[in-house]
């Protein structure tokens, strides 16, 4: 069964064809990073206009790469939230138009669930129950997954998401956008010598990174930071220490079979290394290309929703504030 996935929740226009939820036949992405880097962040109106220019060519390319026609597509999986409203609308309307014209079933996919399904697109299929650490620019969640479509939120950020914290730290240090990769690169040539705080929030699986960001800002303003690379390495280590420790503790408490990593920040080299080395449980870490926004994960998630009987009508709306448990 072939599923066409479409993703346009932020600044990547993507389309993919995935077979049986696990086999990627194509995965095309049109990135807007070079455009938004001029502004130091994503400009919603610019993003939606770029999606309009890219959406149909990207879908066409994905079908051609997969050597698949629309008559072979069993369903269209489309991200309908969370994300930027203007960006989501472009992808959703394109999916609706194709679905209506070709009478193809439509399946709405939660973008956060899609990230988790990166772990079904390589290697060994995950076992339930599993704990997923989903870390991105807008979310930092610990999600217990007891089966397909069964999500329980165990921990979340109380302020800045990990990716958002990296972006803010990069701006403080004068590094480029996007901040996560910039911090990661700078850290390669630095040492974690700064004593930055970690917010553990005893008795909770929640996260908090705003205090860490403020501490870095104060050190920079006081002139105590002499090396940008050392500051980047110190900040990165503080974030990763908290993510890894709280994830492992949560996994042990809920007696899961394995840990899954997902989201854009899952591409961080130190996080990938530390989580795999420190966990006594098996850890599933997606390839770099499946961590950032893409449509293959949307198609995979959509497949499992579709075979369980889930479908959506042409009246489906975008849900910019959708949560992982919605």
UniProtKB/Swiss-Prot annotation:
Q: Which InterPro entries match?
A: ATPase_NBD, Gcp-like_dom, KAE1/TsaD, TsaD
Cofactors: Fe(2+)
Q: Organism's domain of life?
A: Bacteria
Note how many cofactor molecules are bound and how.
Answer: Binds 1 Fe(2+) ion per subunit.
User: Which reactions are catalysed by this chain?
Assistant: L-threonylcarbamoyladenylate + adenosine(37) in tRNA = N(6)-L-threonylcarbamoyladenosine(37) in tRNA + AMP + H(+)
Write out the annotated subcellular location.
Cytoplasm
Q: Name one Pfam family in it.
A: TsaD
Stored SUPFAM superfamilies: Actin-like ATPase domain
Annotated residues for binding of Fe cation = 111, 115, 293
GO CC terms of this entry: cytoplasm
List the molecular function annotations (GO) for this entry.
iron ion binding; N(6)-L-threonylcarbamoyladenine synthase activity
Q: Which GO terms describe its biological process?
A: tRNA threonylcarbamoyladenosine modification
Q: Which UniProt keywords apply?
A: Acyltransferase, Cytoplasm, Iron, Metal-binding, Transferase, tRNA processing
What is the E.C. number?
2.3.1.234
Class of the enzyme per the UniProt entry, highest EC level: transferase
* Binding site residues for substrate: 134-138, 167, 180, 184, 268
Where is it mostly found? cytoplasm
Q: Which family does it belong to?
A: Belongs to the KAE1 / TsaD family.
What function is annotated for this protein?
Answer: Required for the formation of a threonylcarbamoyl group on adenosine at position 37 (t(6)A37) in tRNAs that read codons beginning with adenine. Is involved in the transfer of the threonylcarbamoyl moiety of threonylcarbamoyl-AMP (TC-AMP) to the N6 group of A37, together with TsaE and TsaB. TsaD likely plays a direct catalytic role in this reaction.
User: Can you say what this protein is called?
Assistant: tRNA N6-adenosine threonylcarbamoyltransferase
What phylogenetic lineage does the species belong to? Bacteria, Bacillati, Chloroflexota, Dehalococcoidia, Dehalococcoidales
